[in-house]
Amino acid sequence: GYIGKHLSNYLTEKGGHRIIPLGRSMFREGMSGHLIQTLTHCDVIINLAGAPINKRWTPEYKQELFNSRIVVTHRIIRALNAVKTKPKLMISASAVGYYPPEVEADEYTRTRGDGFLSDLCYAWEKEAKHCPQPTRLVITRFGVVLSPDGGAMQQMLRPLQATKVATALSLIHI
C-alpha cells in the first residue's frame, strides 16, 4: 500500500533495514505454514493491511474492509503464536475513525465513536491485542495521508485541476 511503500523505502535507504513485504496472497487460507516460516526470523512486524476506505461502502465492500484488516491481523497473530522466537515489536495500524467526529482526540482519549468505521477500528485493535508476549504491541491510529505524490492530496486536488482556479491556488503543508 501507499504508506507501506514509503515506509519500506525509508527503512531500507535511511535505516539499512531488511524489509520483507507480505502481499495479500500470503494471508489466504492454506498459506499459514509459509507465513509462519516468513515471520520466524523477524524482529519487528508492521501490520498496515487494509483495503482503501475511499470507495463506496456497499455491504460487500464493508466485508472486504473487515476481512482485509481483522482477518489478516488474526492470521498474523496466529502465525506469531506458532513461531518459536517472538519478534520484539509489532506495530499494528488503525485509524482516527475510532474516535467520534465531535471529540478533539489525542492518545489518551478512550471515547469511541458510533458507526461502521469506529466499529471496524475497534475490532481491528481488539484483534491486534491478542499479540503474544513478550512481543510489545504498538497500535497507531492514522488520519488522512497527505503527500504530493499520492494519498488523499491527489484526490482533493482533482476537482481543482479541471478549472483555471488551480493555477492560481497555493497550498501550504504544515
Enumerate the predicted regions with their spans.
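Conserved small/polar residues in nucleotide/adenosyl-binding loops
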Residues: 172-174
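A short C-terminal helix-loop "cap" of Rossmann-like NAD(P)-dependent dehydrogenase/epimerase domains
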Residues: 156-169
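Conserved beta-loop-beta element that borders a ligand/cofactor-binding pocket
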Residues: 94, 126-148
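Conserved Rossmann-fold NAD(P)-dependent oxidoreductase catalytic core, especially the SDR/UDP-sugar
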Residues: 74-115
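NAD(P)H-binding glycine-rich loop region in Rossmannoid oxidoreductase-like domains
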Residues: 26-75
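Short-chain dehydrogenase/reductase
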Residues: 66-70, 110-125, 146
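SDR active-site strand-loop-helix element
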Residues: 45-49, 90-96, 140-142
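N-terminal Rossmann-fold NAD(P) dinucleotide-binding loop
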Residues: 4-5
